[in-house]
Structures are given as C-alpha cells and as structure tokens.
C-alpha cells in the first residue's frame, strides 16, 4: 500500500508527457521511452550498465518515442526505473539503505542466501541485471511466483498479483507475449518458441540463455543456467527439457 503502481506523476523531473507514465507502464515495458536493448557499443543498454553512475537518472532522461501505454518494447531501463522510483517514493537516500531494500523485502524473506544483487554507483539496485544466485534459489523464486507470492505461510505479494502479471496488455510493439516482468506462452501472438508447453507457462529470460520457466498446471519450475553467447530464443533445448519434465510427472 505504500506505492500505487497506477499513479501518474511518479518522478518530479517528468513535467511533460512523460508525467503520465506509471509504474505499471514500466513493468509492462510500455512507457514509450526510447530504448535499444541491443548489446553493442553506444546503445542505451550498454551505456546505462557500463558508463552511468546513476542508471535510473539516465533511463528517466530518455525521450518519448511512442505515446505512453501504446507501444511495448523490452527495456532494462524500464526495470531500473521501477526500482529507482520506488526508492524515491520511500524517501530512501542513503546509499547502503538503498542497496539493502531488495534483501529486506524479497531475498531474505524467501531465504535466498546465495543471492547477490549488485547496486549501481548511486546505491540503487541494478534491478534489470546483476542478480547472482544458485539454480536452487532461482527455482525458489519461480516457486514463489507459482504460489502467487505466498511463501512459508505468508502472503508477501497482494493476492492475484501473478494473475495480473501474467496477463498481456494489448499494447502494440514486439510480438512476443509479455505481461508484467514475465514472458508468456499465451497472448495476442504466439511466441516463436515454447509452443509445445502448456498455455499457462511463463518465464524469466536472462542473459545468454539463462531461463527460469514456471508451469503452474504441472506444478513445475525448471531452471536453465549457463553462459551461452550463441544461444538463441528459438533454440529448442530448453523447451525440450521442460516438455520432458512435464511428461515425466
């Protein structure tokens, strides 16, 4: 109840059309802010991750390329803005206190002892990147989502959060179905991969082929780790692994 994800005017420097951007827009990658997620020299994603002391300020300064809420484009900058804006809303200015927020709210309550989530130079957690955990702890995070934010008998997320998070918004843009921070098996368009999996499947997609796949109907979470620079989303092996696990249950 401390932060309203549908409220406008969330950042004081946004006094133009950007003032209508909400946290929900950022979570759903439909803020309209100009972005390029291509990992090449000079693109916004590499500029933010490797050259900016305050990643949130950098992402907030991007110009609008589309009307707010009308176009979906995956952006690590949007994820960074969520954490930076929530930190501001909570009035947390101390660097160490800011870096401790995700541990206090998420990682410690779930008992994810291996987790290391790196902050940027300003102290704000680099929420779209730099989260290191063992496969077992990634699986625990997937189980937390599968159980609608309930853990060890406590409801840590509002009831129905995952239903909302795994519902696609009708914004135009990238064809792969996307909810609120989760890639989806079912949406306005069929994804080019994972088509053999149940329709309620959703997943986290990390760098170079890392995946945490949640299949609620099969009561299943599958984690694929590794460092595979040549991995492509259309690579069938993760889908085959999840399919085999489902068939074995």
Model-derived features: positions:
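Carbohydrate-binding/catalytic loop surfaces
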Residues: 43-49, 120-133, 183-190
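Solvent-exposed loop and edge beta-strand segments that line ligand/cofactor-binding
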Residues: 66-75, 126-132, 204-211, 229-230
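Active-site Gly/Thr loop motif
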Residues: 112-119, 166-221
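Catalytic cores of extracellular degradative/oxidative enzymes
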Residues: 9-14, 19, 25, 32-60, ...
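Structured C-terminal helix/loop/strand segments within mature extracytoplasmic catalytic/sensor domains
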Residues: 201-249
């Amino acid at each position: 109840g401390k932060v309203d994800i549908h409220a406008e005017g969330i950042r004081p420097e946004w006094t133009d059309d950007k003032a209508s951007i909400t946290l929900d827009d950022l979570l759903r990658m439909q803020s309209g802010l100009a972005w390029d997620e291509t990992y090449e020299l000079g693109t916004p994603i590499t500029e933010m991750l490797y050259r900016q002391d305050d990643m949130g300020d950098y992402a907030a300064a991007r110009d609008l390329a589309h009307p707010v809420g009308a176009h979906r484009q995956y952006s690590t900058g949007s994820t960074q803005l969520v954490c930076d804006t929530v930190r501001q809303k909570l009035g947390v200015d101390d660097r160490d206190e800011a870096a401790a927020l995700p541990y206090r709210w998420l990682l410690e309550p779930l008992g994810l002892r291996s987790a290391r989530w790196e902050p940027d130079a300003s102290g704000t957690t680099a929420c779209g990147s730099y989260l290191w955990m063992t496969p077992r702890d990634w699986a625990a995070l997937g189980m937390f989502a599968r159980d609608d934010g309930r853990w060890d008998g406590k409801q840590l997320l509002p009831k129905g959060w995952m239903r909302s998070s795994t519902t696609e918004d009708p914004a135009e843009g990238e064809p792969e179905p996307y909810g609120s921070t989760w890639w989806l098996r079912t949406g306005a368009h069929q994804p080019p991969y994972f088509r053999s999996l149940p329709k309620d499947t959703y997943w986290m997609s990390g760098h170079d082929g890392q995946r945490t796949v949640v299949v609620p109907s099969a009561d299943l979470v599958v984690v694929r780790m590794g460092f595979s620079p040549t991995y492509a989303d259309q690579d069938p092996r993760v889908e085959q692994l999840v399919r085999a696990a489902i068939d074995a249950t």
